[in-house]
Structures are given as structure tokens and as C-alpha cells.
């Protein structure tokens, strides 16, 4: 958007055309990673999620708990639909999308302290799932 070169190690999608003109393609899904409590490096709060225009699916590492929300009909995400048989097809779709994206990113879904030990040095990020910067 500022006509600056994009370094090769930058991850993500170029959505500048969509932002600037309102035209262009947008991703069908968004992938989200919660690496845990990285300020104090506490394990037990790690999660992954994927969402489309209507639904959000998330899973916690610690206990494997799954969440499925209908963002259009439940914008506060108060009703977990994961056990509702009406939504099983959507649940499976989003589980698979999340697994595919994690495979693509080499996301091993590890405890918070693993990221401290493998991706940082003196609190400076030195690597990501795709490797060193």
C-alpha cells in the first residue's frame, strides 16, 4: 500500500487491493493461533482456531476442548454448537480446514514454553513455524 518492497520472510496475504478499492479476492477462511501466556511463559492457555464468514471453530491444547460458534446468530459466542448434531458437517469441515492450515504452516501446536525455547532469544522472535527469519 506504500509501494515498499515486501521482504521474502513476511508471511500472509496481500489484501491491499481489497482494502484500497473494495474489489479483489478475500480468503475463505482465517486461521488464528493463540500461543499462550507469552509474557510470563505459562503453559496451558494455547489454542488454535479457524473461521469463515459465519462460523468459528477453536480447540484448546491442554484438554482438547472444542468450540463451534455461529457468529451471525450468536455474535457474543455464548452458545457452543460442537455437540449439536445439526452442525456436525460444519464442525468436520472446519476441523479439516484447521488441520490443513496447521500442516501447511508446520504448526506443531505445542505448549507456550516450547515457543520460548525454539522461537525466541532474549524475548526477541527469531523464528516461526516456517523457520528462522
Language-model features: where?
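Polar, surface-exposed loop/tail segments
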Residues: 1-43, 87-96, 111-116
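Generic preference for hydrophobic
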Residues: 30-33, 57, 68
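Short conserved micro-motifs at the rims of enzyme active sites and ligand-binding pockets
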Residues: 41-45, 61-62, 69-70, 81
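Low-complexity, glycine/alanine/valine/leucine- and proline-rich hydrophobic stretches
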Residues: 46-65
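Intrinsically disordered, low-complexity polar regions and short flexible loop motifs
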Residues: 74
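Long, internal low-complexity/basic segments
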Residues: 81-133
Amino acid at each position: 500500500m506504500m509501494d515498499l518492497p515486501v521482504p521474502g520472510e513476511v508471511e500472509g496475504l496481500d489484501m491491499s487491493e481489497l482494502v484500497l478499492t473494495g474489489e479483489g479476492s478475500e480468503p475463505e477462511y482465517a486461521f488464528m493461533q493463540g500461543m499462550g501466556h507469552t509474557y510470563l511463559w505459562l503453559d496451558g492457555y494455547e489454542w488454535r482456531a479457524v473461521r469463515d464468514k459465519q462460523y468459528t471453530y477453536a480447540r484448546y491444547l491442554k484438554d482438547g476442548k472444542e468450540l463451534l460458534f455461529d457468529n451471525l446468530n450468536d455474535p457474543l459466542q455464548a452458545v457452543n454448537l460442537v455437540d449439536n448434531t445439526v452442525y456436525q458437517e460444519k464442525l468436520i469441515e472446519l476441523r479439516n480446514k484447521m488441520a490443513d492450515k496447521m500442516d501447511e504452516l508446520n504448526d506443531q501446536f505445542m505448549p507456550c514454553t516450547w515457543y520460548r525455547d525454539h522461537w525466541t532469544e532474549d524475548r526477541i522472535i527469531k523464528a516461526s513455524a516456517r523457520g528462522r527469519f
